[in-house]
Amino acid sequence: MPFQDAIYRFGPFELRARTRELYKNGVRLKVRPQPLQILLALLARSGDIVSREELRRLLWSAETFVDFEHGLNTAIKELRGLLNDSAGEPRYIETLPKLGYRVIVPVTQVAPVHAAKAKEKNATTPAASVAVLPFVNLSAAPENEFFADGITEDVITHLAKMKSLKVISRTSVMTFKKRDRGLREIGERLGASTLLEGSVRRAGSRVRIVAQLIDCATDEHLWAETYDRDLTDIFAIQTDVALKIATALRAELSHDERSRVGRRPTDDLAAYELYSRGRNWFHQYTEEGYLRSLLDYHAAVDRDPGFALAWASIAGAHTELCIGGSVGKSPEEAIALAKKAATHALEIDQELGEAHSISALIQFAFDFDWAGAERSFLRALELSPGSAQAHQHYGWLCSSLGRYDAALGQLRRARELDPILIPTDVVTHLLRAGRIGEALEEARKSAREQPGTPRCHSVLGWALIFSGEEAAGIASLERAVALSPGATLFLSQLGQACALAGDVKRAREILQQLCDRSMREFVSPYHFAYVYAGLGEADAAIDCLEQAFDRRSGAIYGIKGSFLFRNLRDHPRFKSLLRRMNLS
């Protein structure tokens, strides 16, 4: 590459040779010509020694009368000041007595045509955005798959603590586990300008991890490293990978952020493996997955009672079971267990964003402490600004309070971080806000992109119904039921839709199915309320809502603006229930 056309990147800096411009984190620095010329010469021969005599010839012609020694020393001193470097403990430029100088930091050299394309390509994508693709399991034992997935998620979690980075969430990156698309296409789909990919090979007490960071627009390798370590070093490896990514993307980290990234979740490797396996079960997002995750999470805290992240995850699993209306035990017992686990997690670690986030969800979903929940969400997002789930749940709180613009802002931020798996929340809250046309457009898009996801067909069904396409809406709700035959949530919504369409016979048949199911297992009274509301039986519907309130079952916190209970809003008993929930 011609010297005069080069673009050099090192640490947070970028030097553009053609325009003679030096940038730090995207901000142009003022620099005199001589220090800039020296920096260009050193970067062009990164790692090599450039003698003082070579620099003299570069800066001053033989005919120029100047105190060369003083002039060069002054220029080097200015340069170190610009880079915040030290002669005694150099990070960028090393002095070799009687020999010269050399650059000791990794330098990336980019062709300007590629840089221009990258700039054009990423005009709407933040420069510091990264998606961590699932690490490939190269171990002989296929059961180590959960271990590789755990490393993927932990690196994402570390990066999500950095305010200056946009980090795509686990749920979205896991859809590309099979690598059936090119890196550039994956980056476009995820809205990320860079991708981290890697592999994990575990053998006995040793682990080999290979990681590389790639620019989606240019296919340039921004950073790569191989770690051959003892398994006990796994946490140090994860931290190092996260910090190296931050450096490569020129992300500025505060002291507190760096400290949080370096914190070990547990000193017990076996507890960590149990936790990782439980996390894999949790991410199935099914009743069985939540219940099985609890077994592994509890086994993890049995080994290490101080494992705060595992306690927060126990709280999360119980909470998801309660809100979904399928708890495997009484809602009261599950809620008590969730609260106890969340409280214990915070007692262990007050700076764990996940613990504040799940505590916030418990505060508003079960205690109706809206102000306390909002404070907890704000703290969670301060500690983990890249948490899609915290933004998502905060959006639920705002929507429950009728703050629809704020809710949509949070949910759209969540979707930026989790572009694959959070389309339906936006549709739901557009419907709650009465923005039917926008909701229908979003719903159709989500159903096209995720045809196998029941919730996508559920929200599409309601968007169609409110748009006047009743038959198409019911067909979409039937599709949701077919995709998730065990979920009473979708069945009960279908019952309401049938009742509203005048098919009372079918609505009552669905009501009977729910009754029959409730004889064998717990069915949330919240789901019965859907059907009764559709049938116009207001008192029966409110009876069920009051039972759901008493037992904190289902998504009772969202009833104020729910479009499924719109015909109950003027009922005195419904208004009384809202007052009991601090929603009047």
Identify the role of each PLM range.
Residues 35-38, 79, 525:
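The N-cap/first-turn positions of alpha helices
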Residues 526-551:
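Sterile Alpha Motif
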Residues 543-584:
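C-terminal non-catalytic interaction modules
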Residues 27-29, 94, 557, 566:
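Pre-signature/interface helix of ABC/ABC-like ATPase nucleotide-binding domains
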Residues 85, 192, 574:
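Hydrophobic patch in the ABC ATPase nucleotide-binding domain
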